[in-house]
Swiss-Prot record:
Source organism: Oryza sativa subsp. japonica
Gene name tied to this protein: AMT3-1
Matching InterPro entries: Ammonium/urea_transptr, Ammonium_transpt, Ammonium_transpt_CS, NH4_transpt_AmtB-like_dom
Coiled-coil regions, chain positions: none
Annotated keywords: Ammonia transport, Membrane, Transmembrane, Transmembrane helix, Transport
Cross-referenced PANTHER family: AMMONIUM TRANSPORTER MEP2
One CC-aspect GO term: plasma membrane
Role summary: Involved in ammonium transport.
UniProt name for this protein: Ammonium transporter 3 member 1
Length: 498
């Protein structure tokens, strides 16, 4: 056998053009895997979840809204969005728009140029560096990919508030506008080296940038778009609960990349973040389910999914910053407080009743995201903070030492900025889109659904996803196919057909 057969591929040699000295193959591989996991949360995860959790006549439209947003964000991101979020500073809350497409840019070592932290708050000659800029050991192409899927899922989560009535043409315009004028501001301010980043506001993986933003913006957009049809608001059953669980499962497992990739390295903090994520999600799901059983006498599968999501959202701002016991506490809170706002406060609030938030994104993402940010300000452990944050000696208020109480104030102030910005900008975007096309579908399309909007239907089945109505069709027995047209209680052995 020739000795050449044993030659190592250039990709695995210690040096060479494809493997520069600064490249860490483990970090690069983990970052691309994390990005792909987050991408799979959207496609197919949320595509499946949205397509199955809605009424049958809206399955195609709901899934397509997610698919379109994922594709549209990609093009906007590499054309101008990435550098507005992670490039050089234009304003304290915004980066300069420029493409992220050139070979020299994408193959260079990744760096977030505005993330250098100075003790005296500036970059002058007398300034002393507190923490150097973020400079991961992989190419910029990996960073652009990783951050893009986060931007995409934010728009898709926002869409959950608008399912079942938003004009698809209006959605096509809304996505690039909202990405440009809202998402990039939150991302730069908190992650890219903006004023909240340097002030020390903690958002480990997007509790504010993604979840609080999408929840508030979704609720605001739902106000401007208007409600679903009266019939749909009264009855909106999921068309396939098992597919809904499939999408939810992809979402849960994909969160390993969502939170595990944010240290920008395959390090010990990444491992802790993944573990805490699962602890909090499991705790929240169980608490939500227990509350359903206590107050409604039955465990709701949809409720379990909502509890899972609120747990995942709540841990996101502090996934790698809190200890395991704190993740359990956050899970208890995220399984109970959003449950209370959705099941109790929502029914008593005129504003919440007026705004038709289809999937309750305000509760599952805005409330849970704010809760996660606030509790991170309480439970962030000092040693863990030193592994990730630019401001040294950061800590939550629960831990003694200088700055703990101030950290909680920072967290609340950061949340208020994100809330106010999204209310104002989302309203302006909706008004701008409304000047071009109607935000809401016409009543004729609302009555028909997918076939009117897309000329396609998800299932060639009878009915609209609702259960068999015994008051109209009588009882059907497994032992007797005779239908009894009466309103008496179902006898033993009787089932309600779907």
């Amino acid at each position: 056998m020739s000795g050449d057969a044993f030659n190592m591929s250039v990709a695995y040699q210690p040096s060479g053009m494809a493997v520069p000295e600064w490249l860490n193959k483990g970090d690069n591989a983990w970052q691309m895997i994390s990005a792909t996991l987050v991408g799979m949360q959207s496609v197919p995860g949320l595509v499946i979840l949205y397509g199955s959790i809605v009424k049958k006549k809206w399955a195609v439209n709901s899934a397509f809204m997610a698919l379109y947003a994922f594709a549209a964000v990609w093009l906007c991101w590499v054309t101008w969005g990435y550098n507005m979020s992670f490039g050089h500073k234009l304003l304290p809350f915004w980066g300069k728009a420029r493409p992220a497409l050139g070979q020299s840019f994408l193959l260079a070592q990744a760096v977030l140029p505005q993330t250098t932290q100075f003790y005296k708050g500036g970059g002058g000659a007398d300034a002393v560096v507190e923490t150097p800029w973020v400079n991961p050991l992989y190419p910029m192409a990996t960073m652009v990919y990783f951050q893009c899927v986060f931007a995409a899922i934010t728009l898709i989560l926002l869409a959950g508030s608008l399912l079942g009535r938003m004009n698809i043409k209006a959605w096509m315009l809304f996505v690039p506008l909202w990405l440009t004028f809202s998402y990039t501001v939150g991302a730069f301010s908190l992650w890219g080296g903006g004023f909240l980043f340097h002030w020390g506001v903690m958002d480990y993986s997007g509790g504010y940038v993604i979840h609080l933003s999408s929840g508030v913006a979704g609720f605001t957009a739902a106000y401007w778009v208007g409600p679903r049809s009266t019939k749909d608001r009264e009855r909106f059953p999921p068309n396939n609960v098992l597919l809904m669980l499939t999408g939810a499962g992809i979402l849960w497992m994909g969160w390993a990349g969502f939170n595990g990739g944010d240290p920008y390295s395959a390090n010990i903090d990444s491992s802790l973040a993944v573990l805490n994520t699962n602890i909090c999600a499991a705790t929240s799901l169980l608490v939500w389910t227990c509350l359903d059983v206590i107050f409604f006498k039955k465990p709701s599968v949809i409720g379990a999914v909502q509890g899972m999501i609120t747990g995942l959202v709540c841990i996101t701002p502090g996934a790698g910053l809190v200890q395991g016991w704190a993740a359990i506490v956050m899970g208890i809170l995220s399984g109970s407080i959003p449950w209370f706002t959705m099941m109790v406060v929502h029914k008593r609030s005129r504003l919440l009743q007026q705004v038709d938030d289809t999937l309750g994104v305000f509760h599952t993402h805005a409330v849970a995201g704010f809760l996660g940010g606030a509790t991170t300000g309480l439970f962030a452990e000092p040693v863990l903070c030193s592994l990730f944050l630019p401001v040294t000696n950061s800590r939550g208020a629960f831990y003694p030492g200088r700055g703990g109480g101030l950290q909680f104030v920072r967290q609340v102030a950061g949340a208020l900025f994100i809330i106010c910005w999204n209310v104002v900008v989302t309203s302006l975007v909706c008004l701008a889109v409304r000047a071009v096309v109607p935000l809401r579908m016409p009543e004729e399309e609302l009555a028909i659904g997918d076939d009117a909007v897309h000329g396609e239907e998800a299932y060639a089945l009878w009915g609209d996803g609702e259960k068999y109505d015994s008051t109209k069709h009588g009882w059907y027995s497994d032992n007797n196919d005779t239908h009894h047209n009466n309103n008496k209680a179902a006898p033993s052995g009787v089932t309600q057909n779907v």
